[in-house]
A protein has these predicted regions:
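Negatively charged
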Residues: 2-12, 16-203
Length: 203
């Protein structure tokens, strides 16, 4: 939910001359820091609803998904289980907001063709089963925080085209038996599939 006055979204709030960090209404956070909060619906499955929702919200803020450099709102993702393609083709995006991903099981194509990203925030991926094409053609990404991948079934083409991502700058913790990894590191800067055990040793 975001807050409006005369049809315009509130981007800053003050009380007694001081900027307000958070505002709540009816038990729901509607404003955080200097950005409003948008609540992502309980999206699930293998469709493109997460992508379509984000693009629709960006349009409400006068932004285009291909040219936006920073998301102009915080995203409450606590009810979502799919982020398939959420930021796909956001080719000018340089910053990804921190999000609650604890319930998410599908991250396929999530950052596909995010050509301006150099990193992403830490993500809880314990419940994720699909990471296929997740960073495909994110050609300028150089570092990815550790991702839990013990339950992931599909990792095909995950880092395809990540030319600046090199060994040691991404660690996938755990590998499921018979996980699909075809094309995982093709055309990337990686020389091996970046799987590690919980002790930090390569698998």
């Amino acid at each position: 939910m975001s807050m409006h006055i005369d049809g315009k979204k509130i981007t800053e709030m003050y009380w007694g001359g001081r900027k307000i960090r958070e505002a709540w209404y009816g038990g729901e956070r509607v404003f955080s820091g200097s950005k409003p909060v948008e609540v992502m619906p309980p999206i699930s499955g293998s469709n493109w609803d997460a992508r379509d929702w984000l693009r629709s919200k960006l349009k409400e803020y006068g932004e285009n998904y291909q040219t936006v450099t920073e998301i102009p709102f915080e995203i409450d993702t606590g009810e979502a289980t799919s982020m398939r393609g959420m930021f796909a083709l956001c080719s000018s995006l340089t910053v990804v907001p921190e999000m609650d991903t604890s319930r998410v099981d599908n991250m396929a194509y999530m950052f596909s063709t995010c050509e301006s990203l150099t990193t992403v925030p830490p993500m809880d991926t314990r419940n994720v089963t699909n990471m296929a094409y997740m960073f495909r053609n994110a050609r300028n990404i150089t570092y990815i925080p550790d991702l839990s991948t013990g339950g992931v079934r599909s990792l095909g083409y995950m880092f395809y085209g990540c030319a600046r991502l090199t060994d040691g700058n991404v660690r996938l913790i755990g590998k499921r038996s018979f996980a699909a990894v075809g094309g995982m590191i093709e055309r990337s800067g990686l020389t091996r599939e970046p799987f590690y055990n919980s002790s930090g040793r390569p698998i």
